[in-house]
């Protein structure tokens, strides 16, 4: 394993260095450890109370969420993020789409709710269902929260600042994860949400997000080279040229975003199907209850005695009446 300092004259990226290059990142390491300890500690507290917690959620939060965060913060992606446009594009894509999706699937807010006392839970419910929370989770708002940060990042001088200043880079990454989490939290609805909207709305929002990915990808592909002065000043003599490097990054943001969106769509469809089945069971129970109430309100009458077969025959029935 080779530890490489960010901003140094990096060696050429080879297949071996893809697997062995890494960089220390103490603030991110502390963040990952604290979040992991809080989440796993909460699960342990629930188990001491005799309450179970789904393993799938734990794997999503720790393995998928924190694991992907560590991947883009310590691995080759982080090492070459300030040198190669496509490496930074891959890093930002994971931060805005993959990491927050897995964090939301881990249901951290539900875990926190289970650990709160009854009064604290009631106060949290008031905040959750406040007008401000409902406004912030309105579908068009959360859509903008997801799609605007990448556009601002790449189509403004902010992108070059993230390359030159590690603090700005960290804050930008935090905003990407936060915006993505708000989106996935409100659309997946694994955790309680202020506005329980329809999953069909989520499907339409996803189409908008796909369109924005295409617009950003095409803009980077057909537009001028971003942060050209910075990249030229590095004096890199290996790897793709600046134009090709940016084209690769544009493809990652465009196609990669669509690929990451596939498991999200699969999860939405699965939850929509489960919700429909649950709703069908509720409707059947309500209809059965209504039928039972109506049956109790009907007057009790003696059932008519069944008629003999010859009483149904016109000629035989007439002869029987004459004899009587």
Which residues does each predicted region cover?
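Alpha-helical membrane segments of multi-pass proteins
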Residues: 1-324
């Amino acid at each position: 394993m080779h530890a490489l300092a960010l901003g140094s004259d990096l060696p050429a990226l080879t297949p071996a260095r893809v697997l062995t290059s890494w960089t220390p990142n103490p603030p991110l390491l502390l963040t990952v450890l604290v979040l992991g300890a809080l989440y796993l500690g909460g699960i342990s507290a629930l188990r001491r109370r005799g309450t179970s917690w789904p393993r799938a959620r734990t794997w999503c939060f720790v393995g998928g969420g924190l694991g992907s965060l560590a991947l883009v913060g310590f691995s080759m992606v982080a090492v070459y993020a300030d040198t190669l446009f496509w490496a930074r594009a891959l890093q930002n894509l994971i931060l805005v789409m993959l990491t927050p999706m897995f964090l939301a699937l881990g249901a951290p807010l539900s875990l926190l709710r289970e650990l709160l006392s009854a009064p604290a839970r009631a106060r949290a419910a008031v905040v959750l269902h406040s007008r401000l929370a409902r406004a912030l989770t309105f579908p068009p708002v959360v859509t903008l929260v997801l799609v605007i940060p990448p556009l601002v990042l790449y189509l403004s001088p902010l992108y070059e600042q993230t390359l030159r200043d590690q603090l700005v880079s960290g804050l930008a990454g935090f905003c990407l994860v936060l915006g993505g989490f708000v989106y996935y939290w409100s659309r997946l609805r694994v955790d309680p949400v202020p506005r329980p909207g329809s999953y069909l709305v989520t499907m339409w929002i996803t189409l908008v997000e796909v369109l924005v990915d295409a617009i950003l990808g095409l803009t980077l592909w057909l537009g001028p080279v971003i942060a050209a002065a910075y990249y030229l000043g590095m004096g890199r003599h290996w790897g793709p040229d600046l134009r090709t490097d940016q084209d690769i990054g544009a493809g990652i943001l465009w196609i990669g975003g669509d690929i990451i969106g596939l498991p999200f769509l699969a999860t939405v469809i699965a939850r929509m199907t489960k919700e429909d089945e649950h709703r069908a069971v509720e409707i059947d129970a309500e209809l059965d209850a209504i039928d039972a109430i109506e049956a109790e309100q009907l007057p009790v009458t003696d059932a008519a005695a069944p008629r003999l077969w010859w009483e149904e025959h016109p000629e035989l029935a007439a002869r029987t009446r004459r004899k009587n």
